Regions:
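N-terminal Rossmann/SDR dinucleotide-binding element
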Residues: 1-90, 94, 369
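Amphipathic terminal alpha-helices
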Residues: 34, 316-319, 323-369
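Conserved Rossmann-fold NAD(P)-dependent oxidoreductase catalytic core, especially the SDR/UDP-sugar
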Residues: 93, 101-108, 112-165
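NAD(P)-dependent short-chain dehydrogenase/reductase
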Residues: 145, 175-227, 231-244, 269
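Active-site Tyr-X1-5-Lys
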Residues: 157-187
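Mid/C-terminal beta-alpha module of Rossmann-like enzyme folds, strongest
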Residues: 241-316, 335, 355-369
């Protein structure tokens, strides 16, 4: 039987992985890394997150305090001496500070703490796979391109945010410092929503689309494409990578790819249909960031009470990503047997429904923690 050390199970993607494993009743001994003062509190945090996924109480009862590994990747020395780690056969490392803000913990957790964790796991004799969750955006893609997986590291690459720089750096450091570790890197594209639950588990990034359409202007064109996948599809792929006996490659995109990426015009139409409104369509204008800054005093009229400075920062960051117009090749994961991903527009109605009544300001908090 596998012994899985799963990090990030109190978050969106890690929660989706645990959801899949519990629903499918997979034969796994769980060891869940959780930040908490004690094991009971850690268990409560896991259960609270899993309730967002509508997990049945009977399934959830399979997770007990024996499955809790108290610890924090910002202080890895506190948990790396736990004897249970020596029995781990598989790791899925979803934990990260995935903030697009200037969180001081980004480097401490995503690079320093994760490296210490990897170096400890590299010493475990029975470890069969260390599946590290990176991000497809860590490669600083060329605008307008279809990006293939590459393990090459560009030290002087330009990154839009510190988060993607940290994810690129840790991949390289783990390869250098843990050459014998059975490392596989999964790079999801942009994870938004859940095919069955919409944004109930997390509103991360979905609010950006609503913000742009409420503004009726943004930095990208409606003809630009964006590579979006739902959390449950990403979790399916991660579990498949964990369970595969042999893997031909060490880096896999989990992405919509060329075929399932969608244009902003398609998103506009799908959101309008879900809201039973007319799409923005021809009233949309592609503008520069400076033009958005000039609208600063209008933001409260458009969005209601909001932090204008934070809204403008969000527009600059997400507008820059949207303008990249990139898709990430998913041929390798499809070749392994993953089904084609759903298109964002196939499940966007559930995202709209699950965020009704929530302001943009309320929805965006998760991404600027």
């Amino acid at each position: 039987m596998k012994t899985l050390l799963l990090t990030g199970a109190t978050g969106f993607l890690g929660g989706a992985v645990l959801e899949k494993l519990l629903i499918e009743n997979q034969s796994v001994n769980y060891l869940l890394l959780v930040r908490a003062d004690n094991a009971q509190q850690g268990l409560a945090r896991i259960r609270a997150n899993m309730e967002k996924f509508n997990i049945d109480a009977n399934l959830l009862s399979k997770i007990t305090i024996e499955n809790i590994l108290l610890g924090d990747l910002s202080e890895p020395a506190d948990f790396l001496t736990d004897a249970r780690i020596n029995n781990v056969t598989h790791v899925i490392n979803c934990a990260a500070v995935a903030s697009f803000g200037n969180n001081p913990l980004i480097w401490k957790v995503n690079v320093e703490g994760t490296l210490a964790f990897a170096e400890r796991m590299a010493q475990v004799p029975g470890l069969k796979r260390f599946l590290h969750v990176g991000t497809a955006m860590s490669c600083s893609p060329e605008p307008g391109s279809l990006v293939a997986e590459s393990g090459e590291f560009e030290e002087d690459a330009e990154h839009l945010v510190e988060y993607t720089r940290s994810k690129s750096t840790i991949e390289q450091l783990m390869r250098q410092r843990c050459p014998q570790m059975p490392l596989t890197i999964a790079r999801p594209s942009i994870v938004v929503g859940h095919t069955r639950l919409g944004c109930q588990p997390s509103s991360s990034i979905f609010w950006v689309f609503g913000m742009a359409l409420m503004l009726r202007k943004f930095m990208c064109s409606l003809q630009d494409n964006i590579d979006v996948i739902p959390a449950d599809y990403c979790a399916d792929a991660l579990v498949m990578l964990m369970n595969s006996e042999t893997l031909e490659n060490d880096v896999y995109h989990i992405s919509a790819g060329e075929e399932s990426s969608v244009s902003f015009a398609e998103i506009d139409n799908a959101m309008a249909a879900a809201l039973e409104k007319a799409p923005v369509g021809d009233e949309y204008a592609q503008v520069t960031y400076d033009a958005l800054v000039k609208m600063r005093r209008q933001l409260k009229d458009i969005f209601g009470p909001c932090n204008e400075r934070l809204m403008l920062k969000a527009m600059r960051l997400y507008g820059s990503f949207a303008m990249l117009n990139v898709r990430f090749s998913n041929e390798k994961i499809l070749k392994l047997g993953m089904p084609k991903p759903p298109r964002f527009t196939d499940y966007i109605a559930g995202c709209v429904q699950s965020t009704r009544g929530l302001s943009i300001q309320q929805q965006m908090v998760v991404d600027f923690k």
